[in-house]
Amino acid sequence: MKLHIGGEEAKAGWKIINISQKPNVDFVGDISDLSQFDQDSCEEIYASHVLEHVPQQRVLETLKGIHRILKPGGKFHVSVPDMDILCHLFINPMADPDVKFHTMRMMFGGQVDPHDFHYFGWNQFFMSDFLRQAGFSNAERVESFGIFQDTSDYKPYGFPISLNVIATK
């Protein structure tokens, strides 16, 4: 199975798990509790702008849960807001107040519902370290996954604001 965590876009061959029941959602659940899936049941897992919504104290166990359901050799495609890029945008003295406000919302979440808050500020160092601790190998940063049309490719103000990584079980 190919599992899209937090997704909404239907795509042939992929199943969607989302925290809310919506059209195209196959499973309702939380990224931090994937116990409804068997060990080694997924060949690929995709999570775009979901992991930052996990409280800091649950990040490692969440990544271990993702690792558990991936088949050996399986790929985890993960995208999060890149705090290094967002900080650069935010402190830019040439940025107007609207740019700064939009950037701040990308840092902390839009906060339009109880699930739209960011608990963790990711960068390449943190991502590589947590993936390694969870048992992943070969964490490689990529510009784009080319799988779904989503925030992983978002480039406001000409900057790609996502940290996109593919890790292997």
PLM regions with names:
Residues 2-88, 125, 165-169:
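Conserved SAM-binding loop
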Residues 58-65, 71, 75-168:
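S-adenosyl-L-methionine-dependent methyltransferase catalytic module, highlighting the catalytic core
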